[in-house]
């Protein structure tokens, strides 16, 4: 049995819980584990907010796909759930979401998305397998600001997904994908 979630959200995190309810309709589960260390929860939340800002040099779909792939790699149920919701919202369908695990074989992804997903996978394995050839292709496609933010996003998603997976934080049903009818 893992560490149980907090039954009561700390007072200092209640404004964040209110924002969750406002945006998602419910409080997101990780606050009940991260809430044991509110300062770090706020730092992670601010980091997420910065990377998800409207003026980010990274396309929102690219950010969502990268996060979804890392969530899958880390076997984080909660992260797969929330990133799936974001991919579906940002692409307007579930097509890319359903194909992200097999992005290499799918014709649905742009060159930019493929490069970002390749980098996310290479940077997320232990040890990372980012080589000079990949760095050269990344530098040819992304400017320094975008590449730095992409790398930060990969690092942050790994932190979040690994924490949530290790704590066994469950999915919340944020992204319900309808089953295909035969």
From Swiss-Prot:
One of its GO terms (molecular function) is peroxiredoxin activity. InterPro entries: AhpD-like, CMD-like. Disulfide bonds: none annotated. This is Uncharacterized protein YnjA. The gene is ynjA. It holds the Pfam family CMD. To M.tuberculosis Rv2313c.
């Amino acid at each position: 049995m893992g560490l149980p979630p907090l039954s009561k959200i700390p007072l200092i995190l209640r404004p964040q819980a209110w924002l969750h309810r406002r945006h998602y309709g419910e409080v997101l589960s990780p606050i009940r584990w991260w809430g044991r260390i509110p300062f770090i929860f706020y730092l992670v939340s601010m980091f997420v907010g910065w990377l998800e800002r409207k003026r980010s040099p990274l396309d929102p779909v690219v950010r969502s796909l990268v996060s979804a792939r890392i969530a899958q790699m880390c076997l984080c149920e909660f992260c797969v759930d929330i990133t799936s919701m974001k991919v579906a919202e940002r692409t307007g369908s579930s097509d890319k979401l359903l194909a992200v695990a097999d992005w290499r074989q799918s014709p649905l992804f742009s060159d930019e998305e493929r490069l970002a997903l390749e980098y996310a996978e290479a940077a997320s394995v232990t040890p990372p397998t980012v080589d000079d050839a990949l760095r050269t292709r990344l530098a040819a496609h992304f400017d320094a600001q975008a590449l730095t933010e992409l790398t930060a996003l990969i690092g942050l998603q790994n932190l979040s997904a690994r924490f949530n997976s290790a704590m066994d934080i469950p999915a919340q049903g944020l992204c319900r994908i309808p089953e295909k009818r035969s």
